Every structure is written in C-alpha cells, then in structure tokens.
C-alpha cells in the first residue's frame, strides 16, 4: 500500500474547500507572515502597509506591545524591551551568559536551569516572548484572511538543534497556532525561487540578516533538499554595518558622549537611513546632532568591506566542510535585508562566479517559501500539482555487526527526506560489504522487517576500520527509498531502490509500533549484550593479529598473562551477562597496554630505518 496519508483530526480537507494556511519567518531582527492568494505567494501587511514586524516585545505592568511601537520604547525602557529573543531559544542560562554577556536584561534561572527574563510583566522565558511575537503575526493573518489559519509553517535556521526546534513549536502552541511543519530557512528560500522543481544540483543560500549571517549549502536531488553543510557568524549582520556607519558619523560630528541613549539612537537612526539610501544612490546628505555632511557609497563600502570579507571566509569554510568549491554551486540565493547593499551582491557574485538570485525581496523570500509549503500541506494544491508530503510510518535502517539495527531515518519523519551516516569495515583487508536494509522500531534484526540487500564490492585493502563507507538513505515524495553506499577514498559505490511500506497494512504497522513499546526494556538489554559481544570479537581478532605479528616483543610470562585474559574474555562471550563481558574487555585492555606501546615503538623504528635525521 502507499504510505499513510496523515492529517490531524478535523483537518481533513473537504473537496473544493480552500483552507487558510500561512508561512511565518520568525526572524532574529524582523518577522513576517505570508500566504498564497490566487496561486501567488504574498506577504501580509499591517494597517500601515508594512510587511516587516520587528521581533521586539515591550512589557508593561498592564500588558505588552509587539513590533514597531515596542522597538521605539527600547530607547526609554531598555530592560523591559526584549529583542533578538531567537538567539536565546533552547539555551540554558549559563550558555546565554557565556555567549551574550552584554545583554541589558536581568536574568533568573528557573527550576530546570532555563533562563527567565525579569520584566514589569513578570519573569518570562524565551518561549513566551516568541509566543507574543507569533500571536501578533497570527492576529495580522486572521485580519487579512478573515479567519483563523488552519495551519502554519514556521521557518528555523538549518543549524537549530532539537531543543531550539521544540522551543519554536512550544511558542507556536502558546500562540494558538497549529504547526504543520518546521521548515529550514535555506530550504524555504530555495522553494520561493521554485528551485525544488528545477534542475538538480548544489545551491548556496547566503543569508545576511540584521543580527546574524548564515551560509547553507544544499543539494537538490529528486525534489529532496539535503543540507550538506551550514556555517556563518552569529555575531555579524546588518546591525554591524549600522554600528560602523554610526561610529563614522560620530567621528565626523565630533560627538563622544556615550551615556546619552537618545543621542545614540539618533546616530544609529541616521546610519540606517543612510545605508538604505546608498543602496540606490551614490551619495546622501546627512544631518544629525548638529552636524551636516555627505557620505558616499564608496565611503560606506570602505567601512563595511572587512565585514563582507568575513562572510565570504565563512562561505569558503562551509564549502570546504561540504567537500565542494564555489565552482560546484549552480545557484546562489540571497536572503536578508542586508543583501540589498550593492557591495554585498557584487562580492558574493565574484566569489561564486555567478549572478546571485535577487528578484524576490530578500526580506520576504523565506516567508514566501514557507507560505508555498503551507499551502501544499493543508491540501490546497490540485491533485495534478500537489507534491505528496507524508511521513515515514516506520523507522528505516540497516544491519550492523551482531545483528543490530542502526536506524538512519526515524519514523514520523516528513518526506521527502535524505539522511546519511558513515560506517567502516570490521575485518582487516575486507574487500566487500553486504548492506541489509530494515524497517521497524526494534533493536535487533530478527525483530524488524527485511526490505532488501545489496553488496558494495571493490573496497580498498585496509586494516579494520580503515575504509569509510557513507550510506545515504533518500525517500522521495512518493515514498520510494533509494539507498546508496560509497567508499570515500575510491568513490566505489552501489545503490538500490525499494518501496518501504509495500505490502504492509495499517494494522501491521500499528502492531510493529506497539511491539517496540512493549519490548523496549528487553530490546535495550539485548542490544547491549550484542554490542558487547561484537566489541569482544573485534578485540580478540585484533589481539590475535598482533600476537602473530609481534609476539617476539613479549616475554613468555607476559604472553601467558595476555593469553589468559583473552581466553577469559572468550569464555565470557559465550554467556549472556553484558557487565561481565565489558569487565573482561577492560581486563584485556589493561593487560595489553604495554604490548601496544612496544608495537608502536617498533613500528616507528621500522618506518625511520635507513633515513637520516634531516629527512624526517
């Protein structure tokens, strides 16, 4: 049968009934909400026609305000005005104090060590502050659409961990939103440009926002985006451009008073306006704090050039992490308002050797991609156009030594999806590997469903653990699983395709999940025992090879002690006590440490034989 089509109770779309769906870009500096109308994705504005909502909340004894009004209050009531709360999401108080020591807020630790921000409205955690921002966006959407959205897609940075993602979901729940999916920001940007339905290849997402810089390298294959590498600088953004320009204006005006917050605000405001104007003009007149003068684009470029260079160094490092060069990138997508700066576009184009995509407003592109995805997920696309986005009903994995199952893609993962993991060889000189694909939630191969087997041959003759095989699982939108195994040093690869859920009924899937829950404790015990037996076999095989090669390095007494320890380990292996096996492994390790050191010394002497000191 096909993969289960899952929808929340009460959310199964009736024929011809259009559902309200929105995409939200919950940003560090600004946030946006967008929807699809008449087949076109568009951002929703406030009553003053503004798309952007500053991600700022001002708290009072009698309530709070969000957005532009809250941002204006920052000058007068800094301690009760929370901004850039996205940086705090999912972090402990100790982590925040280490990373951001100069924040103006007063923090308290909750019982579980999470941060609480002290405000006039009480102590609030980052999830609650984020919920207030999301509530403001939800109210804007409800007003514009004439009803409560049936579902929302919220974007998050690709590097967000589970705690940060869960915090975002919790904030949405507090705001009364039904989250269809969290979507990686770079993927949303690529979707906005329609790259998900275009040619396959490598895409770079250059995201220079107000407070942070992120670079993401994606590979698009069969409609699936795989994040190859991410990088960036959490302390570099357009705000730093503004700061440099404001400092330059201070120097020109001869103003050095750092205690006047209103004066600070005036210079910063003048810097922001000048930066925006210089995106389309060659020069701009400035009047601030009694100083009048002109700043040119050339002067601005000179100020910010070192910061732009820092972003490109991050790009180079991230490409290196992905094993790629700038020439391997087919498309470059610009995200974030700071990418409007002409120098940024020029330098990025030069670095990648191609013109970046900038036709969609860089402030809006992530929200637009999220809106397109939300429109699909609530079922508004006609069948002929709709990409089936479903979940994997049972975990997918492969067999490892000892009859164990290594899960690669957990159940309930949204498809399409791609995940990869590295494995290595178990024996010296191993020239091939049989890859056994499995489906299920249990820890042992015998308790899971076998999907397929395929072989990878032609591995280089190396010691155990020397060859590195990258196994990639990819499930497309139709539920078709493709698995590729590649040895990294030689490029030797093999692959197979299989329909994971073919032949399974809903009842069988439910039974497999229930069995995994009922047998969880026994399964964990069985896995631990199997893992210790595999490790024992590895230790004994390695020791046997060492004794054959270098027994001459040991006295008879020393060899006798090692052999006795190995025989004891072999005996323990036949039993069913993982603790006893682990203890026997430690004994062998202790008894062979001096032997290992002598073997290392002998190996070094052999390697240096016949060479002078100058050659080493």
UniProtKB/Swiss-Prot annotation:
Record keywords: ATP-binding, Chaperone, Nucleotide-binding
BP GO terms, sorted: iron-sulfur cluster assembly
Pfam families: HSP70
Domain of life: Bacteria
InterPro entries cross-referenced by the UniProt entry: ATPase_NBD, Heat_shock_70_CS, HscA_NBD, HSP70_C_sf, HSP70_peptide-bd_sf, Hsp_70_fam, ISC_FeS_clus_asmbl_HscA
GO molecular function per UniProt: ATP binding; ATP hydrolysis activity; ATP-dependent protein folding chaperone; unfolded protein binding
PROSITE patterns referenced in this protein's UniProt entry, alphabetically: HSP70_1 (PS00297), HSP70_2 (PS00329), HSP70_3 (PS01036)
Task of the protein: Chaperone involved in the maturation of iron-sulfur cluster-containing proteins. Has a low intrinsic ATPase activity which is markedly stimulated by HscB. Involved in the maturation of IscU.
Protein family (similarity comment): Belongs to the heat shock protein 70 family.
Protein's name according to its UniProt entry: Chaperone protein HscA
Record organism: Pectobacterium atrosepticum (strain SCRI 1043 / ATCC BAA-672) (Erwinia carotovora subsp. atroseptica)
Lineage, broadest ranks: Bacteria, Pseudomonadati, Pseudomonadota, Gammaproteobacteria, Enterobacterales
């Amino acid at each position: 049968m096909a993969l289960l089509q899952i929808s929340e109770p009460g959310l199964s779309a009736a024929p011809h009934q259009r559902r309200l769906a929105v995409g939200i870009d919950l940003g560090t500096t600004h946030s946006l909400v967008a929807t699809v109308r008449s087949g076109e994705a568009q951002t929703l504005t406030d009553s003053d026609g503004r798309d952007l909502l500053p991600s700022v909340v001002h708290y009072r004894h009698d309530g709070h305000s969000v957005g532009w009004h809250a941002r204006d209050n920052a000058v007068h009531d800094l301690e009760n005005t929370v901004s850039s709360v996205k940086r705090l999401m999912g972090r402990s108080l100790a982590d925040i104090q280490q990373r951001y020591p100069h924040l103006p807020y007063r923090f308290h630790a909750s019982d579980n060590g999470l941060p609480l921000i002290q405000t006039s409205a009480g102590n609030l955690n980052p999830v609650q502050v984020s919920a207030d921002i999301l509530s403001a966006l939800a109210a804007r959407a409800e007003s514009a659409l004439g009803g409560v959205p049936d579902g929302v897609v919220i974007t998050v940075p690709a590097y967000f961990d589970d705690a940060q993602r869960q915090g975002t979901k919790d904030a949405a729940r507090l705001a009364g939103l039904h989250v269809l999916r969290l979507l990686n920001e770079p993927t949303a940007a690529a979707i906005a440009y329609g790259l998900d339905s275009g040619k396959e290849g490598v895409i770079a997402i250059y995201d220079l926002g107000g407070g942070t810089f992120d670079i993401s390298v994606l590979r698009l294959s069969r409609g699936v985006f795989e994040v190859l590498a991410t990088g960036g600088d959490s302390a570099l953004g357009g705000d730093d451009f503004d700061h440099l320009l404001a400092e330059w204006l201070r120097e020109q005006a001869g103003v050095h008073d750092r205690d006047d917050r209103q004066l600070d605000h005036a210079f910063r405001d003048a810097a922001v306006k000048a930066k925006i104007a210089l995106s389309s003009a060659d020069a701009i007149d400035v009047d601030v704090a009694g100083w009048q003068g002109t700043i040119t684009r050339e002067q601005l470029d000179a100020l910010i050039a070192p910061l732009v260079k820092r972003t490109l160094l991050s790009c180079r490092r991230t490409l290196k992490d992905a094993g790629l060069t700038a020439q391997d990138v087919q498309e470059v997508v610009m995200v974030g308002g700071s990418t409007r700066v002409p120098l940024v576009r020029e330098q990025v184009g030069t670095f990648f050797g191609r013109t970046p995509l900038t036709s969609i407003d860089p402030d809006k592109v992530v929200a637009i991609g999220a809106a397109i995805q939300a429109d699909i997920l609530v079922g508004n696309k006609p069948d002929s156009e709709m990409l089936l986005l479903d979940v994997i009903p049972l975990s997918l994995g492969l067999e490892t030594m000892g009859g164990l199952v290594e899960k690669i893609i957990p159940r309930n993962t949204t498809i399409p999806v791609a995940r990869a993991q590295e494995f290595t060889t178990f024996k010296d000189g191993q020239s091939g590997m049989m890859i056994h694909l499995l489906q299920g939630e249990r820890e042992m191969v015998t308790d899971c469903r076998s999907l397929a087997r395929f072989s990878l041959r032609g591995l280089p003759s190396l010691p155990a653990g020397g060859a590195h095989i990258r196994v990639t699982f990819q499930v497309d939108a139709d539920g078709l699983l493709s698995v590729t195994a590649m040895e990294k040093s030689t490029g030797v690869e093999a692959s197979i395709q299989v329909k994971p859920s073919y032949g399974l009924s809903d009842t069988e899937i439910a039974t497999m999940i229930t069995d995994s829950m009922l047998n969880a404790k026994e399964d964990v015990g069985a896995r631990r025992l199997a893992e210790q037996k595999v490790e024992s076999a590895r230790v004994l095989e390695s020791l046997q090879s060492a004794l054959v090669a270098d027994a001459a390095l040991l006295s008879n007494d020393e060899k006798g002690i090692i052999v006795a320890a190995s025989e004891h380990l072999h005996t323990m292996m036949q039993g069913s006590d993982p603790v006893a096996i682990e203890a026997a492994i430690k004994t062998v390790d202790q008894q062979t440490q001096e032997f290992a050191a002598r073997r290392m010394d002998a190996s070094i002497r052999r390697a240096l034989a016949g060479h002078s000191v100058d050659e080493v």
